[in-house]
């Protein structure tokens, strides 16, 4: 699937749409938004799901100063966070070490007290994560826990991707096509676990029905449809495909004819999607000696590391910053050489694998393997992954089991240095064209409302955790007792998704209607969508999940995508439709506890925006071109603005 081979996580190849679509939210065009390997698999199977009778907890706000003082004796002064969502002022600072390969230091930042979590834990009865040795709730273990608010080691500013205006229009049109085709033509779209690029969600080239997706306008013929499973070593005696590249090996997903074991059937009503990758945010990494800075996407839905090389002289390659191996004193080609040859219906992408030193903030990762794109498009520019999205690379942050090359992922190499306070990273997605942030080694309490609830990863491949229920308003929408359901937190896609059996019901309950932004009460006609995970409610208000189409229609930023497998029904939570509103944490197993994902309400305010803008200005290799920024138009309704 997947074409996109490089430059950006799953390229928009196939559902690029999907992802794209998500991107749409980035909105493009029109989103409405208010002003070593895990060793904890043994814990995963033991995680129990919430009883249908158990009442979910309301999403908690901040504790008062008096509560904190009385329960923890903390002398730190913390101002209560008002309902407007302003961040607390906290004294104290922690400086991150400077990059060893740049004269510019990584900007230090202020950190908050862990007493907030301790106090909340004491008052709620939910244990702090470091006290949980078991997540087998049925046998007295933890079902969820509270993050201890360990301050991060450093933050990386993240910027909106280029050409957003064009990109948002295309992704929004794909969202509309998804709704129209699903509802009017009764077509269901699906992806398979481990069949996309880098082991991400998608389908392999040659899967029956892929052409139909293109016919529906859902898989753009201008984007590649190849899979990284097509890596070939042309310089060795074995020129065959690398076996099981980037795939999960479960019997239920190993054979496409046997995967649809839920309500979906492989028939004329089912259409495979090549891939769903699409991000609206890029960060910064340095490659080589001296470091050459590029701006890749950071993707929790894949694992591999790819950049665009200087040998790629196609027009679309020259639009982005390319890495020049000849200018690096430390670059060396893989030995034996590995040639990457990814073919798709109307073109191809070629490249090689190399080894070089990478700079990620203050960390210097020596001898990192990565893919280098050297040619794409062939004799035909159809399928060119750079034609629509100007990714300069992709940094996969998922689990090592997803690696398509068998090499150690860059994040695992950072962990192996032993310098992170916690083996975790966290995303803060800002609104519009403002600067976002990726934190390594901990969290920054200014960017979220405590506490951060942490939930065990149910299977250490994707960042996924069990889903208890979804409510539309006060009506339970999902999930039936006895069924398996889970959410995947995916920073590489923008929209949220629902299975085929659910999206139609959602659109019946939340039909598209003409946007009336002159009426401040307009969104009062729409219900809140609430996810219940581990007994905790995470609501999305209409201002957060609605997008506005070119026809001035307000519609939910949800796509229909089935992910059939024996693991249950998958609900993807994307970077713009969910992660923009919630600060998300991704913690790897420490060998005694499972990997965890954490969620807390994000705090968006002028102070945070100004701070991150300053970080961006001082960060090595970070920059935003004026032509890359999306123009924002002021809206009449004070509670909404178009992104």
Swiss-Prot record:
Keywords: Aspartyl protease, Hydrolase, Membrane, Protease, Signal. Residues 87-99 have a biased composition (Low complexity). InterPro entries: Aspartic_peptidase_A1 (IPR001461), Aspartic_peptidase_AS (IPR001969), PEPTIDASE_A1 (IPR033121), Peptidase_aspartic_dom_sf (IPR021109). Residues 87-116 are annotated as: Disordered. It is an enzyme of class 3 (hydrolase). GO terms for biological process: protein autoprocessing; protein processing. It holds the Pfam family Asp. Inhibited by 49c, a hydroxyethylamine scaffold-based compound. GO terms for cellular component: endomembrane system; membrane. Residues 281-600 form the Peptidase A1 domain. Disruption phenotype: Conditional knockout in tachyzoites results in a severe defect in the lytic cycle due to a failure to invade and egress host cells. Specifically, exit from the host cells upon both natural and induced egress is delayed, and parasites are trapped in spherical detached host cells, eventually rupturing the host cell membrane. Secretion of rhoptry content and processing of several rhoptry proteins, including ROP1 and ROP13, are impaired. Microneme secretion is normal; however, processing of several microneme proteins, including M2AP, MIC3 and MIC6, is impaired. GO terms for molecular function: aspartic-type endopeptidase activity. The keyword Membrane applies. It is found in: Endomembrane system. SUPFAM superfamilies: Acid proteases (SSF50630). Residues 1-31 form the signal peptide. Its EC number is 3.4.23.-. The active site is at 299, 490. Required for the processing-mediated maturation of a subset of microneme proteins, such as MIC6, and rhoptry proteins, such as ROP1. By regulating microneme and rhoptry processing, plays an essential role in the lysis of the host cell membrane during egress and in rhoptry content discharge, which is required for invasion of host cells. Belongs to the peptidase A1 family. PANTHER family: BETA-SITE APP-CLEAVING ENZYME, ISOFORM A-RELATED (PTHR47966:SF51). This is Aspartic protease 3. It comes from Toxoplasma gondii.
């Amino acid at each position: 699937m997947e074409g996109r081979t490089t430059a950006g996580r799953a390229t928009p190849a196939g559902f690029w749409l999907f992802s794209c679509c998500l991107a749409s939210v980035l909105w493009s065009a029109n989103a409405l938004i208010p002003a070593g390997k895990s060793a904890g698999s043994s814990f995963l199977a033991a995680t129990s799901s919430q009883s249908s009778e158990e009442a979910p907890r309301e999403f908690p706000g901040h504790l008062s100063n008096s509560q904190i003082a009385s329960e923890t004796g903390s002398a730190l002064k913390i101002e209560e966070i008002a309902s407007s969502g302003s961040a607390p002022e906290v004294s104290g600072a922690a400086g991150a070490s400077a990059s060893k390969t740049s004269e510019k230091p990584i900007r230090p930042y202020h950190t908050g007290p862990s007493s907030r979590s301790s106090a909340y834990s004491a008052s709620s009865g939910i244990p702090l994560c470091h006290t949980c040795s078991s997540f087998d709730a049925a046998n007295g273990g933890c079902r969820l826990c509270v993050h201890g608010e360990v301050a991060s080691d450093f933050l990386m500013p993240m910027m909106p991707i280029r050409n957003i205006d064009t990109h948002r229009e295309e992704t929004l049109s794909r969202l509309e096509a998804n709704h129209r085709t699903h509802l009017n033509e009764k077509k269901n779209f699906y992806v398979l676990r481990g069949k996309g690029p880098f082991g991400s969600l998608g389908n392999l080239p040659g899967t029956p029905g892929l052409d139909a997706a293109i016919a529906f306008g859902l898989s753009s013929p201008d984007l590649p449809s190849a899979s990284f499973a097509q890596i070939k070593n042309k310089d060795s005696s074995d020129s065959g495909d690398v076996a099981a590249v980037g795939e999960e090996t479960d019997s239920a997903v190993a054979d496409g004819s046997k995967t649809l074991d839920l309500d979906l059937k492989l028939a004329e009503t089912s259409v495979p999607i090549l891939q769903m990758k699409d991000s609206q945010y890029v960060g910064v990494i340095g490659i080589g000696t001296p470091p050459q800075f590029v701006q890749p996407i950071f993707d929790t839905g894949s694992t591999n590391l790819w950049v665009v090389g200087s040998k790629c002289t196609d027009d679309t390659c020259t639009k982005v910053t390319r890495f020049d191996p000849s200018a690096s004193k430390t670059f060396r080609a893989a030995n034996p050489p590995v040639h990457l040859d990814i073919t798709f219906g109307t073109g191809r992408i070629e490249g090689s694998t190399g080894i070089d030193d990478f700079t990620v903030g203050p960390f210097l990762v020596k001898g990192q393997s990565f893919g280098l794109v050297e040619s794409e498009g062939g004799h035909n520019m159809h399928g060119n992954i750079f034609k629509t999205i100007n990714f300069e690379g992709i940094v996969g942050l998922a689990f090592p089991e997803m690696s398509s090359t068998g090499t150690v992922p860059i994040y695992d190499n950072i962990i192996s240095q032993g310098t992170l306070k916690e083996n975790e990273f966290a995303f803060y997605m800002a609104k519009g064209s403002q600067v976002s942030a990726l934190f390594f080694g901990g969290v920054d309490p200014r960017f979220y409302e405590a506490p951060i609830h942490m939930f065990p990863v149910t299977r250490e491949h994707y960042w996924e955790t069990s889903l208890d229920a979804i409510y539309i308003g006060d009506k339970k929408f999902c999930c039936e007792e006895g069924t398996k359901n889970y959410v995947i937190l995916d920073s590489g896609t923008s929209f949220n998704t629902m299975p085929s059996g659910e999206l139609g019901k959602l659109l019946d309950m939340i039909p598209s209607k003409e946007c009336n932004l002159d009426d401040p009460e307009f969104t009062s006609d729409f219900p809140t969508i609430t996810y219940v995970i581990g007994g905790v409610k995470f609501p999305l208000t209409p201002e957060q999940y609605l997008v506005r189409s070119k026809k001035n229609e307000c519609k939910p930023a949800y796509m229909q995508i089935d992910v059939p497998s024996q693991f249950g029904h998958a609900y993807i939570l994307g970077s713009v439709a969910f992660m923009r509103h919630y600060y998300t944490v991704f913690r790897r197993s420490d060998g005694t506890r499972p990997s965890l994902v954490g969620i807390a309400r994000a705090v968006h305010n002028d102070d945070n925006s100004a701070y991150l803008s300053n970080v961006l200005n001082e960060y090595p290799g970070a920059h935003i071109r004026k032509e890359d920024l999306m123009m924002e138009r002021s809206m009449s309704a004070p509670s909404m603005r178009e992104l």
